[in-house]
Amino acid sequence: QAVTVTENWITTYGHKLNAILANNDEMALGAIKALEAGNRKDVFVLGVDATLDGRNAVREGLMAATVFQDANGQGGGAAKVITTKIKGGNPEKITWVPFQLVDKDSPLLK
């Protein structure tokens, strides 16, 4: 689906299209496939999840970056909220879990 959507964006927006922020690495990789077919190597593409394929795409310079989603951090954040609630407390409405940007200089690519 990301290939088709990106092809449509290339047709509709032409060179005004300068960035694609995808919901996950697989969508970002589909967008990259369409961008390559359209000879558009100038578009900033960001994925999410830091999958092996996503990290490889960053390493190869195909994707600008991906975002590492820390499952342990997310689970720990959820556990803190639940524990606070069980103990009768009022947890914050929003719990921020830090993320890590994985770009060409990231230690996660080493």
Predicted region positions:
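Structured segments of extracytoplasmic/periplasmic soluble domains
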Residues: 8-12, 34-38, 57, 61, ...
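Glycine-rich, flexible loop/turn motifs
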Residues: 54, 63, 98
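Short beta-strand elements at the ligand-binding edges of bilobed clamshell
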Residues: 60-72
